[in-house]
Amino acid sequence: GAIDSKLDWSHNFTNMLGYTEPQFTELMRLYLTIHSDHEGGNVSAHTSHLVGSALSDPYLSFAAAMNGLAGPLHGLANQEVLVWLTQLQKEVGKDVSDEKLRDYIWNTLNSGRVVPGYGHAVLRKTDPRYSCQREFALKHLPNDPLFKLVAQLYKIVPNILLEQGKAKNPWPNVDAHSGVLLQYYGMTEMNYYTVLFGVSRALGVLAQLIWSR
């Protein structure tokens, strides 16, 4: 559809995606804001800064950033969390007890795997972007089964990771939550999640490019 200059970026974007639910527009405002930039050390932001430092065209700088985001270690994290949560729910069922969930987490770690959505290369506390999404979920979808599972993991996983002693940061990151919110509002096409990330990051990294010049 056509761009409506009276609406903000997020509202126009959700309209073009075919969504009319006001809460989804509110979620997209949150999502696009918290994913727009994150220091300069992650792959996509760093790449855009690096290419832009050569005075390359901003579109080329952003395209380079998206090539970095295409890498599974960077751009697929929230999808991997959602797949893991779905598998967990399938194996242990809904309304799982804390004890059974602890056993599942320990079995995951003892088999040499990690708990997706936990840990961060820089942060040493709960990712504030996770906290923003948690507040949104508590307000709009407190009884959603997947959100309840995410909230339950938040109570359990950090203590287990601290007890294990290997994680420098046992707290959840932004990817631990975003997929659950998108699924709730009907955006089930997980392959599109990285595109959302890219749309968001455009605002942050290109603003940085302008400031740098």
UniProtKB/Swiss-Prot annotation:
Reaction equation(s) it catalyzes: oxaloacetate + acetyl-CoA + H2O = citrate + CoA + H(+)
Pfam families per record: Citrate_synt (PF00285)
Transmembrane domains' residue ranges: none
Localization (cell): Mitochondrion matrix
Entry GO MF terms: citrate (Si)-synthase activity; identical protein binding
Post-translational modification: In response to mitochondrial stress, the precursor protein is ubiquitinated by the SIFI complex in the cytoplasm before mitochondrial import, leading to its degradation. Within the SIFI complex, UBR4 initiates ubiquitin chain that are further elongated or branched by KCMF1.
N6-succinyllysine PTM positions: K94, K100, K148, K166
GO biological process annotation, one example: tricarboxylic acid cycle
Alphabetical keyword list: Acetylation, Methylation, Mitochondrion, Transferase, Tricarboxylic acid cycle, Ubl conjugation
Main location: mitochondrion
Modified sites of kind N6,N6,N6-trimethyllysine: K168
Pathway note: Carbohydrate metabolism; tricarboxylic acid cycle; isocitrate from oxaloacetate: step 1/2
Entry EC number(s): 2.3.3.1
Residues at the active site: H74, H120, D175
Residues that, per the record, bind oxaloacetate: R129, R201
GO cellular component: mitochondrial matrix
Residues with PTM N6-acetyllysine: K94, K100, K148, K155, K166
PANTHER family reported for this sequence: CITRATE SYNTHASE, CITRATE SYNTHASE, MITOCHONDRIAL
Additional detail: Citrate synthase is found in nearly all cells capable of oxidative metabolism.
Similarity annotation: Belongs to the citrate synthase family.
Assembly mode: Homodimer.
Job description of the protein: Key enzyme of the Krebs tricarboxylic acid cycle which catalyzes the synthesis of citrate from acetyl coenzyme A and oxaloacetate.
Protein name listed in UniProt: Citrate synthase, mitochondrial
Natural source organism: Mesocricetus auratus
Classification of source organism: Eukaryota, Metazoa, Chordata, Craniata, Vertebrata
